[in-house]
Amino acid sequence: MTSLRSTVWRALPTAATVVLTVIIGPSAHADALSRGTAAFDRGEYARAAQDLSPLAARGNPGAFGRLGFMYEHGFGVPQAYPAAFDLYCRGATRGDPFAQAMLGLMYDKGHGVHHDVIQAYKWLNLAAARSQGRAREAYLRFRDAVASKMSRDEIIVGQRLALSWLPGVLVNGRLSGQ
């Protein structure tokens, strides 16, 4: 009985650490995301990159789009379209509307990726569908601007791709719906 009790007492700190990690871990990530997002919104891009980079490395969807934006425009980090595209893709496939919209705009502009209005339309449509308020209105304006450059058949293809898309799914090494 004594050995069982001592074993339990020795294991207690480890168990407490696991429980605290489960309880506190998500809020710590949320706090870091809030800090990074606030720094991003204030234009403090070096600080935002410092806060958001570890979150992106751990797969946090909200960090990918903002970091991608910084890499696309060279804000707080060296400008690098391939890095921006990769970050946008990672956020977009996890369902982050900002990353989806920015990925759509990269396809529209042909920054770091081939110009593809159908893919641009698809990602902007998905971003608008997953957003509310002013963000939704902006993404709809972007999508409609892209649509003005498209034929009716291209719009139909873009709509079908958006409807067939599933978060996080890769098909033949490509993002789903491509």
What are these regions (language model features)?
Residues 2-16:
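Bacterial N-terminal signal peptides that target proteins for export
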Residues 25-26:
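N-terminal signal peptide c-region/cleavage motif recognized by signal peptidases
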Residues 31-58, 176:
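Alpha-helical segment of the N-proximal tetratricopeptide repeat
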Residues 32-39, 54-55, 64-73, 87, ...:
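Hydrophobic face of amphipathic alpha-helices that form TPR/SEL1-like repeat modules
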Residues 43-44, 57-61, 73-75, 80, ...:
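Short helix-capping/linker turns of helical repeat alpha-solenoids
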Residues 135-178:
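Terminal, low-structured helical/coil segments at or just beyond the last alpha-helical repeat
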